[in-house]
């Protein structure tokens, strides 16, 4: 959005080290992508100084039980490889912060790039572009705290039952 920006720079003494920083308008860093030539790291800022209203008492087990892991293949995958995952719009009611996009959204297919030649006498506004799926996506990392908290809750229940 207009309130956010990305900063990219080369960092470090090694020419193969790259750094990309994502920041809010007030310059608060919210994430980075770094690489050193042999690995890439994607991070989301998690510093306590950036947070408020911290609550450690929420019920993760109840929320986790609402998720429906599925096994499926992607239509565009000619190999029909089965993968484990989730359906984004189903997850959105349980962990909305993990989902981007809108259910059933469509967008114009990008067929024109500036500099491409258009049909004679036509301008970009005259050209009708076919629609394509504007796919929803899941940030799987947003599910990890739910998993950890559920394990802690279940461990506490086991300990209580064994006592």
Regions of interest found by a model, annotated:
Residues 1-48, 59:
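Trimeric beta-solenoid/beta-helix "fiber body" segments of extracellular/virion adhesins
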Residues 45-163:
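Intramolecular chaperone/auto-protease modules of tailspike-like proteins
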């Amino acid at each position: 959005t207009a309130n956010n920006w990305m900063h990219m720079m080369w960092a470090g003494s090694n020419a193969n080290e790259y750094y990309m920083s994502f920041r809010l308008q007030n310059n608060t860093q919210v994430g980075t992508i770094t690489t050193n030539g042999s690995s890439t790291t994607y991070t989301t800022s998690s510093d306590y100084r950036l947070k408020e209203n911290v609550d450690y008492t929420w019920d993760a087990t109840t929320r986790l039980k609402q998720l429906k892991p599925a096994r499926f293949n992607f239509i565009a995958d000619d190999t029909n490889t089965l993968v484990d995952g989730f359906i984004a719009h189903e997850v959105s009611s349980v962990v909305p912060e993990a989902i981007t996009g809108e259910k059933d959204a469509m967008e114009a297919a990008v067929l024109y790039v500036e500099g491409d030649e258009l049909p004679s006498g036509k301008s970009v506004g005259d050209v009708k572009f076919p629609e394509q799926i504007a796919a929803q996506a899941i940030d799987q990392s947003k599910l990890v705290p739910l998993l950890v908290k559920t394990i802690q809750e279940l461990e506490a229940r086991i300990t209580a039952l064994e006592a």
